[in-house]
Design a protein with these regions (language model features):
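A short N-terminal helical cap/helix-turn-helix that marks the beginning
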Residues: 7-30, 46
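Conserved AMP-binding/adenylate-forming core of the ANL superfamily
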Residues: 28-81, 98-103, 107
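Structural core segment of the AMP-binding/adenylate-forming
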Residues: 15-17, 57-58, 85-118
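Structured loop/turn residues at beta-strand edges in well-structured enzyme cores
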Residues: 10, 21, 61, 107-109
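Conserved phosphate-coordination/catalytic loops
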Residues: 10, 42-46, 96, 115-118
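A detector for short, charged/polar N-terminal pre-domain segments
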Residues: 1-6
Length: 118
């Protein structure tokens, strides 16, 4: 008899891959302050994979901290998926802090890279 236990670990990487394969046309919507913007899950997965590859090219390795300084957006969602999927640690930085506080937080955390909203 099969148990109800899973045979595959539920890592962020496998959840992302599963979503892209099973629900490629499902959409994620974000409000940019003026209108809704939509992106397909397959596109988010592909962009997250590109981001992870870019971070690896910058020298980010499993266990390294990557800061994110961003509003809620699909780009930030892609970072939420890419960073832990590659084994790095995501460190969200409060965008409402003063510049000196941000500098302290980033330096104290030891972020290897900080992703910033443009």
């Amino acid at each position: 008899m099969d148990a109800t236990m899973m045979h595959t670990p539920m890592t962020v990487q496998l959840i992302l891959q599963h979503g892209a394969e099973v629900f490629p046309d499902s959409r994620v919507g974000t409000f940019d302050g003026e209108s809704m913007r939509y992106k397909r899950y397959a596109e988010i997965a592909a962009d997250a994979a590109r981001l992870a590859a870019g971070l690896r090219a910058l020298g980010v390795r499993p266990g390294d901290r990557v800061g994110t300084f961003s509003w809620n957006s699909t780009a930030h969602l892609e970072a939420y998926l890419a960073i832990p999927a590659m084994g790095a640690i995501m460190h969200t930085i409060n965008i409402r802090l003063a510049a000196e506080q941000i500098a302290y937080v980033v330096n104290h955390a030891g972020d290897r890279v900080v992703l910033v909203d443009a």
